[in-house]
Amino acid sequence: MLKRALLLSLVVLLVVPVVVRAQPSAAPETVGMSKERLALIGQALNGQIEAKSFPGAVVLVARKGRIAYFESFGQLDPKTGSPMTKDAIFRLYSMTKPFTSVAAMMLVEDGKLRLGDPVGMYLPQLAKLEVAVQGTDANGKPTYTVVAAERPVTVYDLLRHTSGLVYGGFTRNEYVKDLYAKNNVGWAGVTPSEQLDALAKAPLARQPGTAWEYSLSTDVVGRVLESVSGVPLGRFLDDRLFRPLGMSDTTFHLPADKVKRLAQPLATDRATGKPIVLHDVTVAPKNDAGGAGAAGSTADYGRFVQMLANGGQLDGKRLLAATTVRHMTSDHLGDIKPAIPLLAPGYGFGLGFAVRRADGLNGLPGSAGEYNWGGAAGTGFWIDPKEQLVAVLMTQAQPGAWQREFRDLFRQLVYQAIID
């Protein structure tokens, strides 16, 4: 009888879904924010929806560890007209990168990885790389000479995007851009080995450690993590990050029972009229792309960023040391200059995040030490330790620089709602 009871109890535990504990909420005024001023966020986002920037959005603002504002606007799917819901799931694109960067620092804390390690220690394909050095001819036209890399690319280079790797669509090194296109160097539709083999065939755009260039570096960090841990990146993140934080909706492959919660973009771009096509997270990927492949909900991401804001812990569970979080969110560029104009004025870059260097030097509000990142389809977050503030914005929109319009508006309205 006892055995039967124990068996039934086990079955119940396996069948009943785990209830994720939500972050605590608070009346805005109790955490130094104005309810009336926060309401301006909704007015502004509804204006963006009417202007066809995106069909819907979910936003979360927390201060002093408690949620002051968590709202949804517009439509989840413009084809069906279904309303946006707070539990909607979004393609995160580059907001995947902070997950992978945090996971790398977990292995550093475990003593299984060092930032100064050459990447070739873990990925032999990338042990001996070349560099396409740019020059100019007598007519001022660019020339390229392929030479050996002066030193190996390190894990540190990957995390701060000084590896010499690029994104083919961003780089100004035309020689490397052409080879990336020819050899299908990217993050989607390739296996891990295919990705690494393609990267090995293309030279770096710059000598390692000499310039900041946003790139596939974080995807390579994911391959390093797989080599060290012996498991796919998605499984490692599930075990060490997502499950411990209760991030039950964050994944590289959205299961069938959650597809109805996936937010969809407008059919066409408002500026060009061309169809908007986003990454399909409902199909099992050939690789867990640590730089762009995840999807997740606003509440999930809110828990992740609150963990960072708390110095590496949430709900009594410590995932990182506070010293590690401070190290990751410090500027690691110094005098190293960006090769492409992607970092906002007044920002450097840490180990996975853009980092604000001063209260000023930028037309938008923020504090020195604030750190942030975003995703191509209209997602973004920032953490301001000085203000004890975290903010998450989720939309699904046409990728492009034009998104700064609504991203900047959201930031401005969050800061104007602080009243203490």
Regions found by a protein language model. Name each.
Residues 8-17:
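Bacterial N-terminal signal peptides
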Residues 398-420:
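Generic C-terminus detector
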Residues 39-46, 59, 65, 90-122, ...:
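Active-site SXXK
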Residues 20-24:
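Boundary at the C-terminal end of the N-terminal hydrophobic targeting segment
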Residues 77, 124-368:
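Short, surface-exposed loop or secondary-structure junction motifs
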Residues 380-382, 388-397:
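Short, well-ordered beta-strand elements
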Residues 29-92, 112-114, 128-137, 277, ...:
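Short, conserved catalytic-motif segment at the N-terminal edge
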Residues 1-8:
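Bacterial N-terminal signal peptides that target proteins for export
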